[in-house]
């Protein structure tokens, strides 16, 4: 539901902005409000799930996320929409780590756990891809508000299934909260994510950006120091083994490279080409099909070959696909210049979703599954925030440069602006492709486990910090 919402809202935003009179300067806040609370509270949410009870927190997160979605669906102004999106992020920060940690503690057999992680990763990929098509259809025929309302029935079904099938689990022993760690981590993450979002508007050198980013990193550094000293840390540094660190680092970089894709391609289809919301959603069909096929295949392969080859090949394919997409222009054949690159990329990403979710919780002690799950989601959100800001900066710079160098051309201004926008998209995609390529190398070098190790406990795993 969380990944579905992230992609479905991208398609709905242009219509929502028009209905609620949201200016271009404030457009990003519909996304930023969600990222702020989701990224800022994930680590705390993971620990709450461990201590209060993963099933209880999972169901509470589901219910709150659904209620916030309904609030956003009835929004009458931009402030109400932003508030609802912030609440969605807050409840999502409880829901996401609780869901992943429940898998880890529910499936104790190594092969069954590997299959469960594979299914979780596959569903994450499928949810994101289906959201693009569903968002277009809902926006076109029922209105953008239904892109938020749709979460309510999904949550009801999920809660009923959880009541019937999920047993409660929580840690025993010392469950005192690491208050200094919670404060420094949460405020630090909020500051970094907010500062990065400001950078996409005001630039990386602006005081409005670094005035938040720098203090945020100071607080996060202090958080690491605190975690090394306290007896019951919010995030136990013992979790940062070579293998899990590789999974987290590759997740951070791959999210940095990918998050701008959906935003830019949505504007390419709707703004540059003038497609309707439903047609724009259908243009993502090759991406959706590729995710479904590759995630399904990878979920069967994971217990047989392990995550290392699956993740490495997947990230490499995604990098190649995004590089091919950087040859985009206004007048190019859809099949060869859009559909084929998207298909290549998605055939890789489906594998990545499966491999990363299983590796991030590899050999995690039951006491720490919520914290480990939270860090995986945190790296994804922080990487996405950085990636979107960096790619927006690249896009804006490339657009301005293109207009400056082509303004003397005998070409109508609307057509010239369209060409300039696509040139900006291409430059942003090249950066994203590089980030994915580096992520593939990291995954290959650091995630050195095979199928035989998936269910074994490795006492010799090196801790990085």
Where are these regions (language model features)?
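12-transmembrane solute porter fold
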Residues: 1-4, 9-11, 24, 205-215, ...
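Transmembrane-helix bundle of Major Facilitator Superfamily
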Residues: 1-164, 298, 305, 326, ...
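Residue-level recognition of transmembrane alpha-helices
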Residues: 31, 61-65, 85, 142, ...
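Small-residue-rich transmembrane alpha-helices and their cytosolic helix-loop interfaces
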Residues: 31, 35, 115-129, 178, ...
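Hydrophobic alpha-helix/TM-entry signal in multi-pass membrane transporters
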Residues: 58, 65, 81, 177, ...
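C-terminal membrane-cytosol helix-exit motif in multi-pass small-molecule transporters
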Residues: 152-170, 186-198, 215-230, 439-449
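Flexible interhelical linker loops that connect adjacent transmembrane helices
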Residues: 159-186, 228-243, 303-304, 454-458
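Intrinsic disorder in cytosolic terminal tails and internal cytosolic loops
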Residues: 171, 411-418, 446-465
């Amino acid at each position: 539901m969380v990944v579905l919402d992230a992609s479905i809202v991208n398609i709905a935003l242009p219509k929502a902005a028009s209905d609620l009179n949201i200016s271009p300067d404030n457009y990003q806040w519909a996304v930023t409000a969600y990222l702020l609370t989701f990224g800022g509270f994930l680590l705390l949410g993971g620990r709450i799930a461990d201590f209060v009870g993963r099933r209880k927190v999972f169901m509470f997160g589901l219910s709150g996320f659904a209620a916030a979605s309904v609030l956003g669906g009835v929004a009458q102004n931009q402030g109400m929409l932003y508030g609802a999106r912030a609440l969605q992020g807050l409840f999502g920060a409880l829901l996401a780590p609780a869901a992943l940690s429940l898998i880890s503690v529910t499936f104790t057999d190594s092969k069954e756990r590997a299959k469960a992680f594979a299914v979780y990763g596959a569903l994450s990929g499928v949810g994101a891809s289906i959201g693009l098509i569903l968002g277009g259809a809902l926006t076109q025929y029922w209105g953008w508000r239904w892109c938020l309302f749709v979460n309510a029935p999904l949550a009801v079904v999920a809660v009923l299934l959880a009541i019937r099938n999920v047993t409660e689990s929580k840690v025993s022993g010392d469950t005192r909260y690491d208050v200094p760690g919670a404060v420094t981590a949460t405020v630090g993450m909020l500051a970094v994510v907010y500062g990065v979002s400001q950078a996409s508007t005001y630039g990386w050198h602006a005081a409005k950006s670094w005035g938040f980013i720098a203090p945020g990193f100071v607080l996060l550094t202090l958080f690491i120091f605190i975690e090394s000293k306290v007896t019951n840390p919010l995030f136990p540094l013992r979790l940062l083994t070579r293998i899990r660190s590789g999974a987290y680092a590759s997740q951070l970089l791959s999210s940095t490279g990918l998050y701008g894709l959906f935003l830019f391609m949505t504007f390419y289809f709707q703004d540059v080409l003038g497609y309707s919301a439903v047609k724009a959603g259908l243009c993502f069909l090759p991406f959706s099909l590729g995710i479904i096929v590759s995630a399904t295949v990878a979920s069967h392969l994971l217990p047989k070959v392990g995550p290392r080859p699956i993740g490495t090949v997947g990230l490499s394919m995604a990098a190649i696909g995004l590089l091919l997409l950087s040859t985009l222009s206004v007048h190019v054949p859809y099949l060869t210049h859009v559909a084929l690159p998207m298909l290549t990329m998605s055939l890789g990403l489906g594998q990545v979703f499966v491999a990363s979710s299983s590796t991030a919780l590899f050999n995690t002690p039951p006491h720490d599954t919520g914290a480990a799950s939270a860090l995986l989601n945190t790296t994804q959100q922080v990487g996405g925030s950085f990636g979107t800001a960096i790619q927006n900066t690249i896009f804006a710079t490339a657009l301005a440069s293109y207009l400056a160098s082509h303004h003397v051309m005998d070409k109508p201004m609307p057509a010239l602006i369209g060409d300039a926008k696509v040139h900006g998209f291409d430059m942003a995609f090249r950066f994203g492709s590089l980030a994915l390529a580096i992520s593939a190398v990291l995954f290959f070098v650091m995630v050195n486990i095979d199928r035989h190790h998936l269910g074994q406990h490795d006492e010799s795993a090196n801790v990085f910090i």
